[in-house]
């Protein structure tokens, strides 16, 4: 998905022109991947424009920064305000929002405590991450030869820029082999997640998803789906999942801020269930989008109107 210029970016407390939101080539982040970030969606509905789970995203941003010893020079509330301000300033009704915290220009090396911590918020128009038709017809995925990092090598609970080099390898491999997306295993050989999404399967009407201990990011859309499913009376199991369990599942789907709830129609060329979006996946999609579109009560308090 391309990143189209939308006007202004919030950078270290000030609104600057899109083209002026730059960093020095010797900034620490450029050389060592020392950034943490979030991906957040703003949706247009009958009541206005609403940011989905804003505070949960900002809390995770601060948690990621804490893991990497990065002291954000703003409060969570100030970052929430900056995100709302950025969307308003750019006149966007529906968009993708990217707050990012990074170590800037200061010192080189792997002990970066004296580097400044910079913060930026950008927002731009955004479509369906895995394709406009993917939400209905699904995507083809392949299990990657690249594994998710063990938790004692890289902290997967941090949404850190450097972690996504691992994801890039898996995604490029998947596309090269003719798949839309990759599925990655954890260091024990169990299913972990996609290159940028969490994963679920459905078997005999019940939902299964890997536990957080399977080297995955604790996804906010993942949490939303679990809450919706349980509210709808669907049993959800968080437990290790083997590769072959995907092959014999009735349904499977990815979740993520960008991917939303995207069905998986095949894995490694093996058709999942009927090879199309299944009834449980559709139920979850319908309830998810009903909340976003203000077609039902926001009983979870997930929408922040701007």
From Swiss-Prot:
Domain of life (superkingdom): Archaea
Record PTM N6-(pyridoxal phosphate)lysine, positions in chain: 159
Keyword Transferase: yes
GO BP field: isoleucine biosynthetic process; L-leucine biosynthetic process; L-valine biosynthetic process
Gene3D superfamilies noted in UniProt: 3.30.470.10, D-amino Acid Aminotransferase, subunit A, domain 2 (3.20.10.10)
GO molecular function: L-isoleucine-2-oxoglutarate transaminase activity; L-leucine-2-oxoglutarate transaminase activity; L-valine-2-oxoglutarate transaminase activity
EC number: 2.6.1.42
Enzyme class: transferase
Required co-factors: pyridoxal 5'-phosphate
Catalytic function, reaction form: L-leucine + 2-oxoglutarate = 4-methyl-2-oxopentanoate + L-glutamate; L-isoleucine + 2-oxoglutarate = (S)-3-methyl-2-oxopentanoate + L-glutamate; L-valine + 2-oxoglutarate = 3-methyl-2-oxobutanoate + L-glutamate
Keyword Amino-acid biosynthesis: yes
GO CC annotation, single: cytosol
Associated pathway: Amino-acid biosynthesis; L-isoleucine biosynthesis; L-isoleucine from 2-oxobutanoate: step 4/4; Amino-acid biosynthesis; L-leucine biosynthesis; L-leucine from 3-methyl-2-oxobutanoate: step 4/4; Amino-acid biosynthesis; L-valine biosynthesis; L-valine from pyruvate: step 4/4
Keywords: Amino-acid biosynthesis, Aminotransferase, Branched-chain amino acid biosynthesis, Pyridoxal phosphate, Transferase
Family: Belongs to the class-IV pyridoxal-phosphate-dependent aminotransferase family.
NCBIfam families in alphabetical order: ilvE_I (TIGR01122), PRK06606.1 (NF005146)
Function: Acts on leucine, isoleucine and valine.
Name listed for the protein in its UniProt record: Putative branched-chain-amino-acid aminotransferase
């Amino acid at each position: 998905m391309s990143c189209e210029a939308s006007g202004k970016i919030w950078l270290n407390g000030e609104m600057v022109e899109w083209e002026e939101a730059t960093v020095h080539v010797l900034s620490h982040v450029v050389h060592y991947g020392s950034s943490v970030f979030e991906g957040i969606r703003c949706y247009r509905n009958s009541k206005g424009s609403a940011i989905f789970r804003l505070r949960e995203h900002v809390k995770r941003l601060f948690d990621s920064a804490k893991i990497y010893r990065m002291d954000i020079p703003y409060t969570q509330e100030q970052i929430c305000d900056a995100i709302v301000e950025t969307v308003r300033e750019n006149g966007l009704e529906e968009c993708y929002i990217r707050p990012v915290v990074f170590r800037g220009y200061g010192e080189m090396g792997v002990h970066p405590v004296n580097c400044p911590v910079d913060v930026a918020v950008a927002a731009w128009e955004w479509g369906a991450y895995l394709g406009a038709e993917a939400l209905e017809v699904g995507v083809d995925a392949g299990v990657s030869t690249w594994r998710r990092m063990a938790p004692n090598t890289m902290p997967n609970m941090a949404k850190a820029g450097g972690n996504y080099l691992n994801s890039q390898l898996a995604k490029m491999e998947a596309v090269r082999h003719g798949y839309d997306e990759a599925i990655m295993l954890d260091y024990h050989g169990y299913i972990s997640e996609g290159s940028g999404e969490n994963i679920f399967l459905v078997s005999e009407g019940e939902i299964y998803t890997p536990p957080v201990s399977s080297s995955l990011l604790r996804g906010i859309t993942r949490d939303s789906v679990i809450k919706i499913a349980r509210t709808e009376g669907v049993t959800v199991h968080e437990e290790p999942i083997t590769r072959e369990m995907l092959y014999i599942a009735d349904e499977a789907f990815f979740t993520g801020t960008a991917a939303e709830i995207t069905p998986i129609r095949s894995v490694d060329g093996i058709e999942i269930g009927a090879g199309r979006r299944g009834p449980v996946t559709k139920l979850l999609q319908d309830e998810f989008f009903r909340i976003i579109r203000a077609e039902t009560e926001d009983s979870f308090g997930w929408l922040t109107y701007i």
